[in-house]
Amino acid sequence: MHHRTLTLFLALAFALVSRAQHATNIPSLPGERWWGGATALGSKMPFGKELPAFNLFNRNDNNQVSPLLVSNKGRYVWSDRPFTFSVRQGDLHLDSPFAPITVPQKAGSTLRDAYLAAMHAHFPPSGKLPDSLFFTMPQYNTWIELMYSQNQKDVLAYAEDIVKNGFPPGIIMIDDNWQRHYGNFEFKPDRFPDPKDMVKRLHQMGFKVMLWVCPFVSADSPEYRDLAEKGFLLTDTTSQPAIIKWWNGQSAVYDFTNPHARNHFIGLLRGVQQRYGIDGFKFDGGDNHFYHRTDLVSHGGKGIVSVDHTRAWAELGLAFPFNEYRAGWQMGGKELVQRLGDKDYSWQAVRLLIPDMIAAGLLGYAYACPDMIGGGSFATFLGIDASQFDQQLIVRSAQVHALMPMMQFSVAPWRILDAQHLQAVKAMAKLHATFGHYILQCARQSATTGEPIVQSLEYAYPNHGYAEITDQWMLGARYMVAPMVSAGTSRSVVLPPGKWKDDRGRVLKGGRTITIDVPLTRLPYYEKL
């Protein structure tokens, strides 16, 4: 057998044996349900009788993962290292190649008890926030409109259309392909003839400006050769820079377990800010599966595993108040913006937004954004004529966003909507701005207490049979939101105990389920009295 093949075979065999040695089965208590592990599993939470194995080493389903599971009976599981979890006949099953995972910690009797205990023990809040503008105004991203054709003329036109159509300016993000190549942080001169002036004009319009960046470096570029010589790239067992396959091809990648590489990268970004007036960065990539290879050699040593690279990438963002992430490992309670993974343009995707946001909160990611209004997966927008969009879907998606911690536009509503639907979406942007002070207040409270901003009814009102409700949420302690997430104009709403005032000013008695009419322009929300 070839030496390299034998080495890989033995490594795999060792991993399998080790995993078998450290299996933990956790029988469920009567009525116990579990949440956690991965933001993208939100729609499956609370987990049912069966859940296929989810490996935190090499899977993230395009979003944040964390080694935390919490139950509605006040128990939680935490491990500093990644593990595989599944549910078998209602019981939680854990596999770890490192060491046995201890039995669940009993912290109380509710989901909130479990979360708070885990949070205080393992990811207490930093006391800091991303910039307040994330919470108080809508965000705008150029991705869906420009995709890989980012350019100065169209970026400015997009921003001008935002203002011209009566939307409040906020943060604007210039997405991928503004740069000459990966690892380079200069604008393409043919597309951006005067980027400094562009940023100046965007600032004059009232925007803060962020740029898309990633940890990848185009092979056979000047940056690649320089970084390789400095030892700032992740290598393989041949001591050569490892080539990683990702969604834009194959590239080398920074090794941020090397503090000198980290400081070098931050210095490059600071240079971009100084040269062009950029306010911050959208940090894409960093997914655990890119680093899950047995032949990778990192500066941090043999104990480094895939998720350690994900965390090292996330730690960069702490240097920039204007930041955004999609992939994550641990880092709950930190002042990082965490966006949901790219969602399709579909009703099914609209229905995923609320449970995924609830899941993000239960992993400690309070400062979260529910992807882009209408969807952020560009492939699902290809080939659709502007006149063929489901306009109701865009409106309902905007309504879900409006009373979340953040809302982000990408597809231009004024391009695809008629006057009636455009007005409905614009009203949601203005509603978010109106609620901005309260949302920021919730964020500041979260920075102190560590509590999620978006809370499920089970979290806020335990032991009322609310575990399965995933189309309503509490925005802080004061408001409950119940939007339409399917085509139609009516829905049932669960009112928890107490008195509630709805968006139309009516006072309602809680502790019951009501059926309400939800015309296109209505976002039902309820203030707790």
Give the predicted meaning of each segment:
Residues 64-74, 359, 395-408, 441, ...:
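Short, hydrophobic/amphipathic alpha-helical patches that form generic packing surfaces
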Residues 21-134, 152-164, 460, 517-529:
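Catalytic and substrate-binding clefts that recognize carbohydrates or anionic sugar/phosphate headgroups
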Residues 161, 165-166, 188, 198-208, ...:
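Carbohydrate-binding surfaces of carbohydrate-active enzymes
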Residues 75, 82-84, 145, 179, ...:
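Short, glycine-/Ser/Thr-/acidic-enriched flexible segments
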Residues 1-22:
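Bacterial Sec-dependent N-terminal signal peptides
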Residues 168-425, 458-461, 476:
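Aromatic- and carboxylate-enriched substrate-binding clefts and catalytic-loop regions
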Residues 130-145, 240-253:
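N-terminal small/glycine-rich loop or linker at the start of catalytic domains
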Residues 55-57, 64-66, 127-129, 160-162, ...:
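Generic recognition of flexible, low-complexity loop/linker segments
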